């Protein structure tokens, strides 16, 4: 980690049925940039819908932000109507171009591209098994393990490499075998995973049984070559894995080709908004959605045990996203309201640490009756990828990223709301920043409970020994950061704000769903 925050591993997107699929993936990835800033990539099938004959998948990926990796020329070369895209922040696997996604597996006459958000807990075991069977790897990423496992299962199912996209009955049989390979793989991998997978003529989304990482489905009006969407009728029937071999159409939107809507699968609803799409629903935990030119199919490969990462609502997700029916902005606002009720203090102004602390600060101000002021400005041009080689330089980065508005703070008793305290280094620098701006008192309030345990399911976290709340009591932390008072929201209060208790709370209580 290069600063005192948790980082999500990745953002994923898949587009099906749009002439400019790569460009739409670019827009969607830009909306998901907050989920990963180390690398970006897009894969596209050039003729996947109109004709699978001779179709191929092209790939462009590199280190850096979306806007740095892709030029207009890149996007023009990525021509096609099926696409997957990825932004990455590493947890499993190093920060190298070899681990950038999408991963592509090419055969004689066919290819598979895969994007993954999350982290497997059994990837080392699976990798060893695959290597014993002759598989080779080009990266240290657990995501490549998923891709190689799908290929292995496809071959074991009788699928023919190089012929899944030829016409006739054999092609349909191979498509069924490939979907079954994805179902089998999803049942073998353990941990957190939200996947976007594509072949030359198919897009697949997969969400793990606990739904730890978010994944949602939307539609983009226009379809191929601007065709208007057909009126589809949704069937409520959902096929099991055993029934899949008999019929690939589970919950489907029956449409008459070629009049169909373009579809998008993405980590957050903000990506659907970025391509002017319409949100349809979240994928359920343990669900696979298959998109072909015939429409949508849904396969329930495992029973849902909903445990969405609670930190999506605290910090990771964009405030304009809605995850599993809960508005991120509203959740943060309600956390602030509860925090004000639980930890009131006399003060003159309330401020929020940009960006994820602002929603909670607004809620705190409303509930407490204390005025909200801006107080802190964030430098928008400092990326999260800045690597400071020493701890002292990392701590000093807060003065580059943030600056105080003296007229808002001078002579005031200030309540500052942040989303979390991880190591405590950023919090200490924030208090120094506010006092330097003339704040008479600084009362630190945190809209999440104390982070006491590391995450093993797709978040870049320090070791337990580096987490200040695991080694210090509340008063000790207050002294360490230099605040006049310090309080965290309770876990009970946080769940009250969210209106549910269907979350992974491992970083707070050490209890993990996997």
Positions of predicted regions on the chain:
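Intrinsic, low-complexity polybasic segments
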Residues: 159-165, 223-230, 235-242
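Short, glycine/charge-rich flexible loops or terminal/linker lids adjacent to PRPP-binding catalytic cores
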Residues: 369-415, 425, 452-460
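Secondary-structure transition/capping motifs at alpha-helix termini
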Residues: 135, 156, 344-348, 366-373, ...
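Serine residues within intrinsically disordered or low-complexity segments
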Residues: 51-52, 163, 228, 235, ...
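PRPP-dependent phosphoribosyltransferase catalytic core
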Residues: 201-202, 276-282, 301-303, 432-514
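A conserved beta-strand->alpha-helix junction
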Residues: 70, 139, 144-149, 372-383, ...
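Conserved short alpha-helical segments that host acidic/polar catalytic motifs at enzyme active sites
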Residues: 1-222, 258-284, 290-347, 353, ...
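Extended, hydrophobic alpha-helical segments in both membrane/secreted and soluble proteins
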Residues: 350, 357-364, 368, 372, ...
């Amino acid at each position: 980690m290069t600063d005192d925050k948790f980082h999500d591993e990745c953002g994923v997107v898949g587009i099906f049925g749009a002439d400019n699929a790569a460009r739409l993936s670019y827009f969607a990835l830009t909306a998901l940039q907050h989920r990963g800033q180390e690398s970006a990539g897009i894969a596209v099938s050039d003729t996947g819908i109109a004709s699978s004959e001779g179709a191929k998948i092209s790939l462009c990926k590199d280190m850096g932000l979306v806007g740095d990796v892709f030029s207009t020329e890149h996007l023009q070369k990525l021509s096609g109507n099926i696409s997957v895209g990825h932004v990455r922040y590493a947890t499993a696997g190093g920060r190298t171009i070899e681990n950038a996604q999408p991963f592509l597996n090419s055969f004689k006459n066919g290819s598979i591209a895969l994007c993954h958000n999350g982290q497997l807990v059994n990837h080392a075991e699976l990798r060893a098994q695959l290597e014993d069977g002759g598989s080779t790897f080009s990266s240290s990423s657990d995501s490549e393990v998923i891709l190689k496992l799908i290929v292995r299962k496809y071959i074991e199912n009788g699928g023919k490499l190089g012929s899944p996209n030829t016409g006739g009955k054999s092609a349909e049989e191979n498509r069924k075998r490939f979907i079954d390979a994805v179902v089998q793989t999803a049942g073998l991998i353990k941990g957190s995973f939200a996947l976007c997978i594509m072949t030359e003529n198919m897009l697949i989304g997969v969400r793990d049984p606990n739904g730890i990482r978010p994944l949602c489905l939307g539609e983009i009006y226009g379809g191929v070559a601007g065709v208007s969407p057909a009126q589809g009728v949704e069937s409520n029937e959902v096929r099991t894995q055993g029934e899949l071999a008999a019929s690939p159409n589970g919950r489907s939107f029956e449409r008459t080709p070629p009049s169909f809507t373009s579809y998008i699968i993405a980590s957050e609803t903000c990506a659907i908004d970025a391509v002017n799409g319409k949100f349809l629903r979240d994928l359920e935990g343990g669900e696979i959605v298959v998109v072909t030119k015939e429409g949508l199919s849904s396969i329930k490969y495992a029973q849902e045990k909903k445990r969405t990462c609670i930190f999506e609502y605290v910090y990771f997700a964009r405030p304009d996203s809605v995850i599993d029916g809960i508005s991120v902005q509203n959740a943060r606002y309600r956390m602030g309201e509860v925090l004000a009720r639980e930890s009131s203090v006399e003060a003159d102004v309330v401020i929020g640490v940009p960006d994820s602390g602002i929603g909670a600060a607004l809620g705190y101000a409303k509930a407490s009756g204390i005025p909200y002021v801006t107080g802190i400005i964030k430098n928008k041009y400092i990326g999260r990828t800045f690597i400071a080689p020493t701890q002292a330089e990392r701590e000093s980065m807060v003065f580059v990223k943030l600056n105080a508005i003296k007229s808002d703070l001078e002579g005031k008793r200030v309540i500052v709301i942040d989303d979390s305290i991880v190591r405590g280094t950023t919090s200490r620098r924030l208090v120094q920043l506010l006092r330097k701006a003339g704040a008479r008192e600084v009362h630190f309030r945190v809209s999440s409970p104390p982070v006491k345990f590391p995450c093993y399911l797709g978040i870049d976290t320090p070791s337990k020994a580096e987490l200040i709340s695991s080694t210090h009591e509340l008063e000790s932390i207050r002294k360490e950061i230099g605040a006049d008072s310090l309080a965290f929201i309770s876990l009970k209060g946080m769940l009250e704000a969210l209106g549910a208790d269907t979350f992974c709370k491992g970083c707070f209580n050490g209890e993990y769903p996997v």
